Amino acid sequence: MKPARRRLLRLAAGMAALPALMRIAGAQSYPSRPVHIVVGLPPGLTPDIGARLIAQSLSQRLGQQFIVDNRPGGASNLATELVVRAAPDGYTLLLAVAGNAIEAPIYTNLNFDFLRDIVAVASIGRTPFVMVVPPSLPAHTVPEFIAYAKANPGKINFASPGSGSANHVFVELFRLKTGVELVHVPYRSSMLPDLLAGRIQLLFAAIPGVLADIRAGKLRALAVTTTTRVEALPDVLAMREFVPGYEASGWLGIGAPKGTPDGNVKTLNQQIGAVVADPAVKARLVGLGIVPIAMTPTEFAKFMAGEVDKWAKVVKFAGIKPE
């Protein structure tokens, strides 16, 4: 073979290998500039605070800024679409939350598909809810509540911040599993005054928002919505102990646009796993009502798919439509 031809073949082989080498180099140097975490909720809510805690820790660990970018609107769909349309390079991430899985079967005419277009990167944790009633309601346990509700169909009102919210669909899952008839009352302001006064008889709430009233005896906790008891309410039983197959919780994690390099996903997953395992970070997450749970990208993807499937059944059962 002539020397010129050999040089040409070596050059061609080198060029063919260039994309793979660039991907490897990119993964090794990631992140090399600031990373944005898009949050589809206003500042100050629990998921936003959790995202800022993770962002701060990642900034310290990786030597690049992780910036929380709040983009509320259209449920969480505005933020999700922004990330879907971003360059799939690991520099625009999504704070994926339970609302994404709940909204997926409600908003069916969007320009994206949550499971198809968002890559699961890392789980941060789950937020247990608690079933609470006012002391005036003659039910001290979940079986007593179910019996009372069936004896008084349509006479128990439950509150939520709106149709399709976690507080709403968690109760609808309870209805689906138990067959009780309850009346949904959506609120645009605080639900607690009416609940404390007994004008609303039921609320499924994130634990931090009602913990003080439970401890003061102003509200009665009947069950937590996770499969096991939680540290904040050790004497409150898990719903599954009364209602087989019931499990519902808020959750949050990190997603990225489809096509994000595997190396960048792996780096983020490992670093976020280390962050949520850090005792100081873990304590702060628990203080927010978030139970830290790390997963591999594959495990988190399977979890998200299961959540979408579960809430699709509940949305259909309850006839929930876009507002």
Q: Language model features by range: what are they?
A:
Residues S32-P34, K177-V180, D262-E323:
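An extracytoplasmic/periplasmic, membrane-proximal ligand-sensing/linker region
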Residues K155-V236:
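Ligand-binding pocket segment of bilobal, Venus flytrap-like solute-binding proteins
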Residues I24-I37, A87-Y91, I146-I156, R215-A216, ...:
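Immediate post-signal peptide segment of exported/extracytoplasmic ligand-binding proteins
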Residues R7-A27:
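N-terminal export signals
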Residues G26-L115, K155, V180-Q201, A294, ...:
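N-terminal (or domain-start) structured segment
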